């Protein structure tokens, strides 16, 4: 491949911090696997470490705001104007941005941007199952919101002032998804206890 950007749209022809975070999460897992390997494996781990250190998370604050933005374009700048707030699949982006050894963001970016100073907290029930967080644009959210941030990050024991247990929250979000498919209020063909899992396939139309 050429290494050039393949834009999703006219103005989405530059950096994408969310997808970068997903990629980096996987690469860091590879780094940990190979770091003590043979010479080729150590060389691969070193290349990954350099990529990790090169990601400029701080740039995506769009002028030192206490929030991270999804897109930046070399031709359109910040015109897509998409600051990211929780909760959704993007938590890993804020965690990696805070953890960066070279371009780390201050804690206020997580608290003000992601958690919106506590507005992310909204205890409620969906399908009779307890959830603790407010999900963007929906009561619960699709299954990938429970998955993507934890492909390389273990949620067991993970908590903060906004959520007493990210493991239990994501488990319950998964159970909500399953319960909805079993109830199948819109009578979709095939939905049931053996056919469930609405991940990146949902839409505003149901």
Whereabouts are the PLM-identified features?
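Ser/Thr/Asn(+Pro)-rich, low-complexity disordered segments
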Residues: 1-206
